[in-house]
């Protein structure tokens, strides 16, 4: 799981930093983006996801808030927010309730520009095909399975970041 986590996180960090460097007008905190991108999936080891060598007891959808808890204990509250808010295009309180997700009842959508950038960059990489950057079309197809709101958010990020 460690090698998968680090490889995936490096891909996300590199994509996010490349976007940040291409958009100096956004004044993105690149040091924070690098750190938070490297830590955004720290909670995966607590989940039951054998395909990525994780044998914990929680459903995979919980990895964001579980990672957030780890980083809060380490006194990294801003990094913790990235963990909690990066899944998909973020998860709203309404989605948590409607889909009966096993998550704390609070909004988990990215707010800061840095949170949004890491969430966006994360969409381009899976943990099962580490070397492959996903196409925009593939990402749209994956997001459509969850909600049309996710696709709309993704398109807004494409306009902002690409």
Features from the language model and the residues they span:
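A short, charge-rich alpha-helical start-of-domain segment used by transcription regulators
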Residues: 2-8
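Short alpha-helical patches at coil-to-helix transitions and adjacent helical residues
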Residues: 9-13, 64
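Divalent metal-dependent catalytic cores for phosphoryl transfer on phosphate-bearing substrates
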Residues: 25-137
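A hydrophobic, small-residue-rich beta->alpha segment in the mid-to-C-terminal subdomain
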Residues: 138-145
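Charged phosphate-binding loop/patch that engages nucleotide di/tri-phosphates or the phosphate backbone
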Residues: 146-162
């Amino acid at each position: 799981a460690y090698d998968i986590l680090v490889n995936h996180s490096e891909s996300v960090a590199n994509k996010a930093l490349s976007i940040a460097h291409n958009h100096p007008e956004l004044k993105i905190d690149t040091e924070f983006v690098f750190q938070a991108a490297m830590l955004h999936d720290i909670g995966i080891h607590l989940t039951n996801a054998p395909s990525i060598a994780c044998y914990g007891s929680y459903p995979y959808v919980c990895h964001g808030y579980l990672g957030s808890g780890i980083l809060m204990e380490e006194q990294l509250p801003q990094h913790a927010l990235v963990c909690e808010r990066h899944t998909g295009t973020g998860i709203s309180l309404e989605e948590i309730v409607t889909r009966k997700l096993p998550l704390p009842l609070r909004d988990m959508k990215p707010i800061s520009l840095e949170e949004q950038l890491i969430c966006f960059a994360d969409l381009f990489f899976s943990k099962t095909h580490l070397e492959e950057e996903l196409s925009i079309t593939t990402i749209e197809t994956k997001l459509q399975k969850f909600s049309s709101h996710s696709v709309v958010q993704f398109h807004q990020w494409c306009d902002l970041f690409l």
